[in-house]
Amino acid sequence: KRSLRDLGIPVNQIIPEGGSLKDLKDLPRAWFNIVPYREVGLMTATFLEKEYGMPYVSVTPMGILDTAEFISQVEKLVNAWASVLSEERVNYMLYIQNQTRFV
């Protein structure tokens, strides 16, 4: 959550953390999904991609390399939406460098 907040990406839902059945109706509002634990959420993410065209990132952001890969994949998805919405593209490389510089 912290990394997404640092990157200026609002979080729609965190399932199952504090989620309820009532909250599930808002899932299709997300631009993309994050599946940090494939064994728990991959089937749901695959369903949402198939039914609603919502892509997902399934890299667990643990360790330097996987965190960098996670942020790179998020960047690609955000930039895909930026081109659709005619908004400015983002570049998270500096964020990745700052997060991994002293590790």
Swiss-Prot record:
GO BP, one annotated term: light-independent chlorophyll biosynthetic process
Cofactor: [4Fe-4S] cluster
Pathways per UniProt: Porphyrin-containing compound metabolism; chlorophyll biosynthesis (light-independent)
InterPro entries, per database record: ChlB/BchB/BchZ, Nase/OxRdtase_comp1
Location(s), subcellular: Plastid, Chloroplast
Catalysis: reaction(s): chlorophyllide a + oxidized 2[4Fe-4S]-[ferredoxin] + 2 ADP + 2 phosphate = protochlorophyllide a + reduced 2[4Fe-4S]-[ferredoxin] + 2 ATP + 2 H2O
Domain of life the protein comes from: Eukaryota
Cofactor note: Binds 1 [4Fe-4S] cluster per heterodimer. The cluster is bound at the heterodimer interface by residues from both subunits.
UniProtKB keywords: 4Fe-4S, ATP-binding, Chlorophyll biosynthesis, Chloroplast, Iron, Iron-sulfur, Metal-binding, Nucleotide-binding, Oxidoreductase, Photosynthesis, Plastid
Subunit structure: Protochlorophyllide reductase is composed of three subunits; ChlL, ChlN and ChlB. Forms a heterotetramer of two ChlB and two ChlN subunits.
Known function: Component of the dark-operative protochlorophyllide reductase (DPOR) that uses Mg-ATP and reduced ferredoxin to reduce ring D of protochlorophyllide (Pchlide) to form chlorophyllide a (Chlide). This reaction is light-independent. The NB-protein (ChlN-ChlB) is the catalytic component of the complex.
Protein's name in the database: Light-independent protochlorophyllide reductase subunit B
This protein's encoding gene: chlB
